[in-house]
A protein has these predicted regions:
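An extended, acidic
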Residues: 109-223
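DPxDG-like acidic metal-binding loop motif
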Residues: 44-99
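N-terminal subdomain of lithium-sensitive/metallo-dependent phosphomonoesterases centered on the IMPase/IPPase/PAP
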Residues: 1-55, 199, 212, 216-223
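Short glycine/threonine-rich catalytic loop with a Thr-x-Gly-x-Asp
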Residues: 14, 61-64, 149
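Generic detector of well-ordered alpha-helical packing
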Residues: 15, 38, 54-57, 88, ...
């Protein structure tokens, strides 16, 4: 395990996995671009660009937890059109195209939650909330929901898309963290924005939820 400049961990597995993914993509789609967490950008202005996070949840991976996964997005002219979350140990493969979302080939949808006081709220790391966003507002949200847990990284979005949670929040995100999530959450019938309620493709944070409560969540977090 090594540390990046931001002190986040990176493993040999992260690097080897991304190298293999890049090799496959360049063989099959030589004109496509690639943006990866470990090795940066290659032809990022191409019409089609793959965005790769070989191990999302590296801290979980090095701890032996099973909730880590791989994130893959395909962008067309800068917009994500396909997103994948793969949990290899859990044998769960989630794919979305903004219209539908499939888990191991079967359609899944976000559950219909119309009231925040009935919602399950997830986030990746509560310590990052106050560092990047408004801690007091987040604390108020946690008091209003039915259940709050730190089940994060891509596993939190998997739980949201498959109907086991209602709100997933990350106060800071990189492009390789967020792009795959957008077609998945949209395809599962949810809503996904940044912390301010804007286009998540141009923001650096994520708020994803059931459509019925999204505007209220944004209001509580930001306004």
């Amino acid at each position: 395990v090594e540390s990046k400049l931001d002190s986040s961990p990176v493993t040999v597995a992260d690097k080897l996995a991304e190298e293999k993914m890049r090799e496959i993509i360049m063989k099959e789609f030589p004109t496509h671009g690639i943006i990866g967490e470990e090795f940066g950008s290659d032809n990022p202005d191409a019409e089609y660009v793959w965005v790769l996070d070989p191990i999302d949840g590296t801290k979980s991976f090095i701890s032996g937890a099973l909730s880590f996964g791989t994130l893959i997005a395909l962008l067309k002219n800068g917009k994500p059109i396909i997103g994948v979350i793969n949990h290899p140990i859990l044998n769960e493969f989630l794919i979305g195209d903004n219209q539908n979302c499939l888990l191991n080939g079967s359609k899944v949808e976000i559950r219909n939650c119309s009231s925040i006081n009935q919602a399950t709220l997830l986030t990746t790391d509560h310590l990052n909330i106050g560092k990047y966003q408004n801690q007091n507002k987040f604390d108020e949200l946690t008091k209003k929901v039915k259940l709050y847990r730190n089940w994060g990284d891509c596993y939190g979005y998997y739980l949201l898309a498959t109907g086991f949670a209602d709100i997933m929040i990350d106060p800071i995100m990189n492009v390789w963290d967020s792009m795959a999530l957008i077609p998945i959450i949209n395809g599962a019938g949810g809503m996904i924005t940044d912390y301010q309620g804007n286009d998540p493709t141009i923001g650096n944070s994520i708020v994803a939820s059931s459509k019925g409560i999204h505007s209220e969540v944004i209001k509580l977090l930001y306004e």
